[in-house]
Design a protein with these regions (language model features):
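Sec-type signal peptide cleavage vicinity
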Residues: 2-8, 22-280, 292, 298-300, ...
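Surface-exposed, low-complexity/disordered Ser/Thr/Gly/Pro/Asn-rich loops and linkers
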Residues: 133-149, 325-406
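Extracellular carbohydrate-recognition regions
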Residues: 277-360
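Extracellular carbohydrate recognition
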Residues: 393-395, 502-519
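Extracellular carbohydrate recognition and processing domains
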Residues: 440-491
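N-terminal, active-site-proximal structural segment of metallo-dependent hydrolase catalytic domains
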Residues: 522-598, 610-612, 814
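Metal-dependent phosphoester-hydrolase catalytic domains
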Residues: 523-524, 702-713, 720-824
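Structured beta-strand-rich core segments of catalytic domains in phosphoester-bond hydrolases
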Residues: 569-667
Length: 824
């Protein structure tokens, strides 16, 4: 809101004097009841017992009529007319004409304003002198049926007052096929909306004005389709070079400049074809957040809300009952939020989107297009801004929706404009989650040190320490925005941005966010050479079993692998149940040839199958099974889930793939239940995995009969941790047996951990938690051919714990896939 040292208009009252004479045919004192006078619309005015009858009509050239509001609708909603400051209720004659009988004026001047039902909030004491033009408007024409209209008496029109608009209307015809969420027009230094004094010269500004108008087009979640006319009411003025920002339901944005010159009662129509800004994948400038104070403008700034009452974070005064569709017509101070905390109960919000869990009303959340946000915890709107942790010493969180517009693996730039609150005493943690690694970061154009960037599990993190931020001494003085830029590689359609103060203890964690923008910088990588895909698909892809594996098949096709290895490749349970299915109902593993053909693989083979968790390999190239492993040379000590050597013939090149799935428990194999705790304490699960791995290595990559074979891959669910990740785990001194299984490979083979070596210094979890237990190893000859390698995180593979069927399983799996391209 722009500031001026003037009185607030809505609190102002004018004392207007009335007289009993006027120009025209003077007939005072005749004793005729004004209601019985014999007069018709359009005649010269006449005075009967000190009153003048005026008929009320709508000017056919009124701006809102040109905008499509029917004059008959306006007249039917007419409630009262103010003439020279005095209110008169509207009456109707026998012909249905609306009229009032107003006190005659000695000077013969009559300034009138027409008020509509429920319209008093638009002008306070009198529409003749006050007018509120909201900065937040709606795509429906509701406001155009409520904002007062005005007329001045003239001899030319006689006793008819033709009501016009004091505002101008900009009508934008937005072409295209998008669904529009908001249209914002802004001109720095202007008074486009706010509270005004109505004078003969026009609308005079108060100390509560705005340099923008935002048209809310959310329409109850249906939005407004392009191809429509979008009308906004503006204070008359020249707004050449104004910025026009159009946002869609899926957070695409178009920004352009527009020359606008609207006159009082003027109607200016312009055509705009919606074309999203090049390469912008996702944007939120919080244009739909229009309520509350201008927190960045300082104490001399103001704002507007549906009520002038203070808003608290929680409780009865939190504004939680606000619907989001109310008109903001009351002035509020710069530091007053426009709503309560959008989310305030972590137990309710955790793991859900804002659309699923919120403390504000459903209508409010929809009206701000916030339903897709991952978190807006302890967040609330100010004017054009989202405030986090305001008015509380507890930490708040903002987390965007997933950037679903990303297709494949992309390099992106994420830009955040933010400002810490006065007295901020935390550090800010920005995390790119579920896809993508931060390659570089800058703050206000200055590069941040690499040691402030890390990757852990599924989260790429950047920390901003206090000494790098400008912490305001007080928000009562105007503030500037910081700009953080994050360059990210391998972002996917599941990627989202999470940020908050890092500490969870009591403190000043508050910050404000102006905008978030994600820009596409191009593909991270394309398929190159032989593409190998591995995944533990949890119980034979239990999650997609009732759907005949259609989603799974489409997902595989999207990556176009040449070879697939699936762990837990057998059906076990009935649909969405933990009840074991009869053997006759178990589609897998026998059904793999049929499934594989649906995603383009002609060949398939099953590994050592001794229980419910075998491995299956499928391929575009011929497969020869060289060895199946189930038992070992020690009785009662099998390779628990089997293993195999599957040989591919890739255009004449023979590649051996060892598939395996190691013992999963902390206790040893075959240990009776009563002894399992003791077995765990003795780390017998780790020792059994070590035993299995020694047997597999001795009979595959180190077996004399395969000494001439040079091209090897080994992959599967190893259920064990690697010394490559010791920098993160730090188990060497406290839990050294965790590394026994992987140490067999490290100490006895030349196999290379592809993911571990491709991303040094990064801890890349292969599960939904913080564990890297799935690996793809390569011989030196194969590792030298690695072109691309990634642990896939996308919208399909993000592990989500089953909350519907109480199975304890995940959708689609509790593991993440690994994808590697080899340039052979």
């Amino acid at each position: 809101m722009k500031n001026r040292k003037m009185l607030s208009i809505l609190g102002m009252m004018f004392i207007l004097c009335s007289a009993i004479s006027c120009k025209g045919d003077d007939k005072p004192g005749t004793g005729v009841n004004p209601a019985d006078r014999d007069t018709a619309p359009g005649e010269p005015i006449s005075i009967v017992d000190g009153k003048v009858r005026f008929y009320i009509d709508i000017d056919t050239d009124a701006a809102r009529v040109k905008a499509g509001v029917a004059a008959s609708d306006l007249l039917s909603a007419a409630s009262s007319v103010y003439v020279n400051g005095t209110k008169y209720d509207v009456a109707s004659d026998e012909s249905g004409n609306l009229y009032i009988d107003a006190l005659a004026n000695a000077q013969g001047t009559y300034t009138a304003s027409l008020a509509f039902e429920d319209g008093t909030k638009w002008f306070g004491t009198s529409p003749t002198i006050n007018l509120a033009v909201p900065a937040s408007q709606f795509a429906s024409d509701g406001a155009m049926k409520l904002l007062p209209m005005f007329a001045d008496y003239s001899e030319a029109t006689g006793n008819k007052l033709f009501m016009k608009d004091a505002v101008g209307i900009l009508s934008l015809h937005i072409g295209g096929s998008a669904k529009i969420a908001s249209v914002k027009l802004q001109k720095e230094g202007s008074d486009m909306a706010g509270l005004f004094l109505k004078t003969k010269e026009g609308l005079e500004s108060s100390d509560t004005t705005a340099n923008f108008v935002t048209l809310n087009c959310t329409n109850g979640g249906e939005f407004v389709s392009a191809g429509s006319d979008f009308n906004m009411m503006l204070r008359p003025g020249n707004y050449s070079g104004a910025e026009l920002v159009i946002c869609t339901d899926d957070n695409r944005v178009m920004r352009t400049s527009l020359d606008v010159d609207v006159k009082a009662n003027g109607f200016e129509a312009k055509n705009i074809d919606f074309k999203a800004d090049d390469n912008v994948l996702w944007y939120d400038g919080f244009d739909l957040c229009t309520w509350g104070g201008n927190i960045m403008g300082g104490s001399q700034a103001a704002g507007m809300s549906p009520s002038s009452a203070a808003v608290t974070s929680t409780g009865a005064a939190s504004g939680a009952d606000r619907l989001g569709t109310d008109y903001a017509l009351s002035a509020v101070a710069y530091n007053v939020p426009g709503c309560g905390f959008i989310q305030n109960n972590w137990n309710n919000a955790s793991g859900k989107t804002v659309g699923d869990a919120h403390d504000m009303s459903d209508s409010y959340v929809i009206s701000r297009n916030l339903t897709g946000y991952t978190y807006l915890f302890r967040s609330q709107e100010f004017q054009g801004v989202m405030g986090v942790s305001y008015g509380t010493t507890a930490r708040g969180i903002i987390a965007t929706p997933r950037f679903t517009a990303i297709n494949g693996f992309r390099n992106v730039k994420i830009v955040v404009r933010f400002c810490p609150n006065a007295g901020f005493d935390d550090l800010l943690l920005f995390s790119v989650i579920d896809g993508g690694m931060i390659t570089s970061a800058s703050l206000d154009g200055k590069a941040l040190p690499e040691d402030l960037i890390e990757y852990v599990a599924n989260s790429a993190n950047t920390r901003l320490l206090n000494d790098r931020l400008s912490i305001p001494a007080s928000m009562a003085t105007p503030q500037e925005w910081h700009t953080l830029e994050l360059n990210v590689k391998n972002a996917t359609n599941s990627t989202y941005l999470w940020f908050a103060g890092e500490s969870v203890t009591t403190g000043n964690h508050c910050f404000f966010v102006d905008s978030i923008e994600v820009t596409d910088l191009g593909e991270s990588f394309k398929k190159s050479g032989l593409r190998v895909l591995y995944w533990n698909i949890q119980d034979g892809m239990w999650s997609d079993q009732p759907n005949q594996y259609k989603n799974f098949i489409e997902w595989v096709k999207s990556y176009d692998p040449d070879v697939c290895v699936w762990c837990e490749a057998a059906s076990i349970y009935k649909d969405y149940s933990t009840v074991s299915a009869p053997e006759a109902e178990r589609y897998l593993p026998n059904g793999w040839p049929e499934i594989a053909k649906k995603y383009g693989h002609e060949y398939s083979a099953l590994g050592g199958h001794r229980d419910n968790f075998p491995q299956e390999i499928t391929s575009k190239y011929p497969i020869t099974t060289l060895l199946k492993i189930t038992d070992t040379d020690q009785a009662g000590k099998p390779v628990s889930h089997g293993a195999a050597i599957q040989q591919l013939d890739v255009k004449g090149r023979k590649i051996n793939i060892v598939t395996l799935h190691m013992w999963p428990q902390a206790y040893g194999y075959g240990v009776p239940k009563a002894q399992q705790d003791a077995s765990k304490a003795n780390n017998e699960g780790d020792k059994y995995r070590e035993f299995e791995m020694k047997y597999i290595v001795d009979h595959t990559v180190n077996a004399p009969e395969y000494a001439s074979h040079t091209d090897w891959l080994m992959m599967g669910d190893f259920n064990s941790r690697s010394m490559v990740d010791e920098w993160y785990y730090k188990y060497a001194d406290t839990k050294p047996t965790y590394y026994l299984c992987q140490n067999v490979i490290k100490d006895n083979t030349n196999l290379v951990d592809i993911i571990g070596n491709f991303y040094p210094g990064c801890f890349v979890s292969s599960t939904g938690g913080k564990s890297r237990i799935d690996y793809m190893y390569a011989s030196a000859s194969m590792y030298s051919k690695v072109k691309n390698a990634i642990t896939i995180i996308d919208t399909y593979t993000v592990p989500v714990k089953d909350a519907k069927y109480n199975s304890g399983f995940y959708f689609p799996s509790d593991h993440r896939p690994i994808l590697v391209d080899f340039e052979l």
